[in-house]
Amino acid sequence: YPIMPIYLKTIGFSILLIGILEGVAEATAGLSKGYSGKLSDITGKRVPFVQLGYAFSAISKPMMAIFIYPLWIFFARTIDRFGKGIRTGARDALLSDEATAETKGKVFGFHRSLDTLGAVIGPTLALIYLYYFPKDYKTLFYIAFIPGVLAVLSSFLLKDKRVNDIQPKVKMPFFSFLKYWKESPSAYKKLVIGLLAFTLFNSSDVFLLLKAKQSGLDDTLVIGVYIFYNLIYAIFAFPIGIISDKVGLKTIFIIGLIFFSIVYFGMSVNTNLYLFFVLFFLYGLYA
């Protein structure tokens, strides 16, 4: 992930074009999450969505390096986010099935901790590779296909829980998942409205990395600060998840938003190398 904005800049993408790319990609992920999540509920299946989602994301990695045409890059990045959208709802449902009201934070915190540990190991290996082969970003995308395939293969160890009720076959238009809004409880609606407002002011982590690079950090330090952020994320996700079960999910969520605000304000005015690490430390706690 930290390689991508640097790679896009080297092949001629402007910051505006990178922003449009990320917007299209995240919109694809968001819409596919809603549709795939509902389809997973209707079919009673979780694992096939997880497998298909990881497969799409794996395929997208070498696609980023095959051609450098903007439309092709848009297509490859969208495939990656489409895969994320397909698997996310089903994966979270699998986690929810294993959690109780008292262990929600613990279960999801443990998942995020291990998931983010991979985001530490991957960029670290990429950093080592770039030390010996500077600027060879394309090869890294080809190499990234290997762990992607391993993720798909490991997903075959998962098993769906037996569903007693036979699910009827129904036609499901793509935007039909939006109908849930009408029947959802008021507490859910308030949460979604709050998240929507937050998302409108949020931006991709790509821009934080580009800001760091724009402020004078070289490619190695940009990747290094991203590794540091993910390391903090991985270390604290599980214990903070446990704490959230004790003090309340809402309290931890609000504290996270405060950290987010501090980080983005700091990023807008900071040019100091060491302060970037402080800000990414707080960003890791927020995440």
Residue map of PLM features:
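Transmembrane alpha-helix termini and helix-breaking/packing motifs in multi-pass membrane transporters
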Residues: 6, 10, 121-141
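C-terminal transmembrane helical hairpin of 12-TM major facilitator-type secondary transporters
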Residues: 249-287
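Symmetry-related core transmembrane helices of the 12-TM Major Facilitator Superfamily/SLC fold
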Residues: 138-156
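Helix-to-loop junctions at the C-terminal end of transmembrane segments
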Residues: 32-44, 130, 237-248
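Cytoplasmic helix-loop-helix junction between adjacent transmembrane helices
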Residues: 76-117
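Helix-loop boundary and gating motifs at the non-cytosolic
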Residues: 1-29, 187-225
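Structural signature of the two symmetry-related core transmembrane helices
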Residues: 48-62, 145, 251-266
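Juxtamembrane intracellular "pre-TM" segments in multi-pass secondary transporters
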Residues: 160-194
